[in-house]
């Protein structure tokens, strides 16, 4: 019976890890496109295109995107540590975001037992949105330009199942 449980846990882990987005290596063409693209700052989750919010919902594993539950606005309270003061607060908080005519770059922190910082790049149009690349930043980055540079240089690590 112990062997069956171990096999079940192993299979479940494999399924869960495969269902999450993996950091994609940027092609040379996409890297150059992002370098040259003009991005405008987005200061709120509600300022992101609906498709990008849907993409975040998929990354977070949410059934229905709820700003109050899934990600806090910049500077708002969230569950930054495993010492939960208010379980109603979201586990994530937006730090910065920027969008161009066809891409959005989202940078947020994720609380819990360890505070981590995550980056997600989405290609978006009014018709469709797709996750392009992203991962865990090696440390807190100071500016959205630093976030873009981390993405372009390939210094992001795999976020695994924890987005």
Describe the role of every protein-language-model region.
Residues 6-17:
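Bacterial N-terminal signal peptides
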Residues 19-102, 135-163:
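Flexible low-complexity loop/turn motifs enriched in small/helix-breaking residues
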Residues 110-113, 138-139:
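Solvent-exposed loop/turn segments at secondary-structure junctions
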